[in-house]
């Protein structure tokens, strides 16, 4: 069982080591001005391209976290993210890196936050719609 570090750079290194040079892995780092956690990126989002609903990720994960954070009075980024996700998406909190990796491989999105030893795993699976085939 690999644990999640409170240092976001350590989590990024773990994810990059596990997934290597996979071309389908999407990693996004966000540094939010109101965070007081030093030089580390405040948020790190990882998912697999093609397995996830991009519109869901952009509109219900990234936009609320990055844009709405600027207008909030809360000093706790973790609580802000949980309140955003609680309103718009199915999510779990995970403290085991192995479980986070398995979730990403299933099509979920993982969000790491500086200063937290947990990740938020958001259900973001996208299944392609197939047309009805004629019987032969």
Show where each model-derived region lies.
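Membrane-embedded alpha-helical signal segments
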Residues: 1-136
